[in-house]
A protein has these predicted regions:
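AAA+ P-loop NTPase nucleotide-binding core of proteostasis motors
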Residues: 1-331
């Protein structure tokens, strides 16, 4: 989309909001239900059907590590505000103490850091059309939660210099891993999508969502949770979804090799080996990208830079002695 303020969007750009699910699901796989809830709430707010004083949208993302929570926030920033640089990510582990929590709006006068401004307010003041991501909210000091309540109720904060910063054109997202262990234990990786299994999976997801919400209420007050548009629970990734994510992650390598006039062929055994190395239920696909870089892209770059291959050749990635090797097959 564009970085034009969302209250000035043209008819064509408004149509992009109608197609938001499709655009998001092209980049974030396996989380269709989460994407649908997110897109519907944003459209309701844009149509003026929700609170007018708060942010454009506000959400809590629950789920295991590496299933797409942060990635969805990043893609949302790109699709709604025109670029991934419109994502403001705040790591809550850095704001777990009272004196660090105050840094979000700026240190008080006379304290170290007063001239630096607020870690949150300064960023939003410079980029008022943005997705603001509070990552791992369970690690935040309670003072941070009070600031969040003010953002959701009033749509603004005052920094330590007395300047008012508007959050009304931001999308506010909290992420949390609460309930993740139970979700992972109950997940069924690699099963088909028969009606019976799908129904059982949906029932487990609903049960785990309720359990995660109860756990969330142990550190977030119900009145704060109630201010959010949606609490969205992400599902653990199935094996079939991970294979599609692998294809997405390796597509840039395929294109890069094609620019050399060559073809990259990743054998099924190499694909399985890389997925096994880069994915597990506890970490999701968080390390899959790094695994592809170190185990596939590195030997591939060695072949390209050594002039062992020439235009028209096929570079075959396969497994030999428990590692990826690149064979050059002449045209």
């Amino acid at each position: 989309m564009t970085n034009i303020p969302i209250d000035r969007l043209s008819l064509n750009q408004m149509k992009d909001l109608i197609r938001l699910e499709k655009r998001l699901s092209q980049s974030v796989l396996g989380q269709n239900e989460a994407i649908e809830q997110l897109a519907r709430a944003i459209r309701r707010n844009k149509a003026g059907l929700n609170r007018q004083s708060g942010p454009l949208g506000s959400f809590i993302f629950l789920g295991p590590t590496g299933v797409g929570k942060t990635e969805l926030a990043r893609v949302l920033a790109r699709e709604v505000f025109g670029g991934e640089d419109s994502l403001i990510k705040i790591d809550m582990s850095e704001f777990s103490e009272r004196h660090t929590a105050s840094r979000l709006v700026g240190a008080p006068a006379g304290y170290v850091g007063y001239e630096d401004g607020g870690k949150l307010t300064d960023k939003v003041r410079r980029r008022p059309y943005s997705v603001v991501l509070f990552d791992e909210i369970e690690k935040a000091h309670p003072d941070v939660l009070n600031l969040l309540l003010q953002i959701l109720e009033d749509g603004k904060l005052s920094d330590s210099h007395g300047r008012t910063v508007s959050f009304q054109q931001t999308i506010v997202i909290l992420t949390s891993n609460v309930g993740a262990e139970q979700m992972i234990q109950d997940s069924e990786l690699g099963f088909g999508a028969s009606g019976q299994k799908k129904s059982a999976s949906e029932n487990r997801h609903e049960k785990n969502s309720r359990a995660a919400l109860r756990e969330l209420e142990e550190f977030l007050r119900p009145e704060l949770i109630g201010r959010f548009d949606n609490v969205i629970t992400f599902k653990p990734l199935s094996r079939s979804i991970v294979r599609r994510i692998f294809d997405n992650l390796t597509s840039d390598l395929v294109k890069a090799v094609a620019r050399h006039g060559m073809t990259l062929d990743i054998t099924s055994s190499a694909k399985r080996w890389l997925i096994d190395r880069g994915f597990d239920e506890q970490r999701g696909v968080r390390v899959l990208r790094r695994t592809i870089q170190s185990e596939l892209a590195d030997p591939l770059s060695d072949v390209l830079l050594s002039n062992k291959a020439k235009p028209g050749d096929t570079l075959e990635a396969k497994i030999d002695n428990d590692k990826v090797v690149i064979n050059v097959n002449r045209a």
